[in-house]
């Protein structure tokens, strides 16, 4: 059985699902948000994993105490993935620009394919 914070999901639904590029789905059984067919953002245990340009991911890992490398199911670290862990779900609103950057990054990658 997968564990995730349903309050986080409610806030992310509000933040993300108004964007016409974003659709909901699942990743390893966890709620996830896709841009086209590519995973952009997902809930995982007590946090939110997301894919970003490597430079942004590195900067957040160095400067933001709420971020850690995203390693779902014990997988190795990935240079473009981070996890944001917040206790209060409403605090994810402060990361709206980061979520938008993830969506744009995934969309641009698909345009280049």
Where are these regions (language model features)?
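Charge-dense, helix-prone N-terminal extensions
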Residues: 1-113
């Amino acid at each position: 059985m997968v564990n995730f914070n349903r309050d986080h999901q409610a806030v992310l639904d509000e933040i993300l699902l108004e964007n016409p590029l974003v659709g909901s789905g699942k990743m390893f059984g966890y709620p996830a948000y896709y841009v086209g067919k590519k995973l952009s953002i997902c809930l995982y245990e007590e946090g939110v994993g997301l894919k970003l340009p490597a430079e942004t991911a590195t900067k957040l890992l160095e400067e933001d105490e709420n971020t850690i490398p995203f390693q779902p199911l014990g997988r190795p670290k990935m240079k473009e993935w981070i996890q944001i862990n917040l206790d209060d779900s409403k605090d994810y609103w402060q990361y709206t620009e980061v979520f938008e950057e993830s969506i744009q990054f995934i969309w641009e990658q698909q345009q280049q394919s």
